Amino acid sequence: MTLDALQQRLGYRFSKPELLQQALTHRSHSAQHNERLEFLGDSVLNCAVADMLFGMFGKLDEGDLSRVRANLVKQQALYEIAQMLQLSDALRLGEGELKSGGFRRPSILADALEAIVGAVFLDAGFDAARALIRKLYIPILEQVDPRTLGKDAKTLLQEYLQGHKIALPQYNVIATHGAAHSQQFEVECIVPKLEVRVFGTGASRRAAEQAAAKLALDEVQKLVPQLLKRSRAERTGKTRKQPVPPDPQLSLRLKE
């Protein structure tokens, strides 16, 4: 992807395009890499996301706001935004990193996204960086449920199962499709105790696992109440008093 095409995706045009080029440069490519920009972008991102959360969720306290922000700026969340922007097509990697599939690595893509935020901050200041972050995050924030504090599907599924003392799910890659630079992964998620088996697809194993976990969570939340209801009914049946058989000796005495 050209720098011009990426700027169109970002909705921001750099006055100093070399900043964007540096933001896309991994340390394996050259000494003029993106790690300092990543450091800067991380701080700008945290501040801008905090500002948005403060305005959107007036009833959340400081602790809950911090937890929502942590889930929104963690590597997986940044990686998914980077995938949406197709940053893997614009990265500048060294030959070894390129051959090992570095353009698909979540850590590299997440770091590049933070570096882009840092580059925008240097290019035009905080307001421009905040506008970019808002553009990228508003679709995500509109789907955030304050009750779950922005946790991803795998975390929610794990916590739900643990809360009901059910063994954790199993994730298995069952297929990969497409060329190396545009692979699609297919993953199954199994919850043996509930006989749940669902499938998810994504541009990475993690993304496919998240998709499968979301489907599994929907199924599990339907099945667990039914399981609990049956369990309560069985316990009630076992504890209900059985009728006491008549005493034969007592019957004889009464007849006398």
Curated annotation (Swiss-Prot):
Q: Where is this region: Disordered?
A: 229-256
What does UniProt give as GO cellular component?
Answer: cytoplasm
Q: Where is the active site?
A: 42, 114
Q: Alphabetically list the UniProt keywords.
A: Cytoplasm, Endonuclease, Hydrolase, Magnesium, Metal-binding, mRNA processing, Nuclease, RNA-binding, rRNA processing, rRNA-binding, tRNA processing
Listed Gene3D superfamilies: 3.30.160.20, Ribonuclease III domain (1.10.1520.10)
**Positions with a binding annotation for Mg(2+):** 38, 111, 114
A single GO molecular-function term is:
rRNA binding
InterPro entries for the chain: dsRBD_dom, RNase_III, RNase_III_dom, RNase_III_sf
- Report any one BP term from Gene Ontology: tRNA processing
Q: Show the PROSITE patterns listed in the entry.
A: DS_RBD (PS50137), RNASE_3_1 (PS00517), RNASE_3_2 (PS50142)
| EC number, UniProt record | 3.1.26.3
In what residue span(s) does the DRBM domain sit?
A: 152-222
Co-factor requirement: Mg(2+)
- Reactions catalysed, as given in the entry: Endonucleolytic cleavage to 5'-phosphomonoester
Q: Self-association or partners: how does it assemble?
A: Homodimer.
- Protein's job: Digests double-stranded RNA. Involved in the processing of primary rRNA transcript to yield the immediate precursors to the large and small rRNAs (23S and 16S). Processes some mRNAs, and tRNAs when they are encoded in the rRNA operon. Processes pre-crRNA and tracrRNA of type II CRISPR loci if present in the organism.
Tell me which family the UniProt entry assigns to this protein: Belongs to the ribonuclease III family.
What is this protein identified as? Answer: Ribonuclease 3
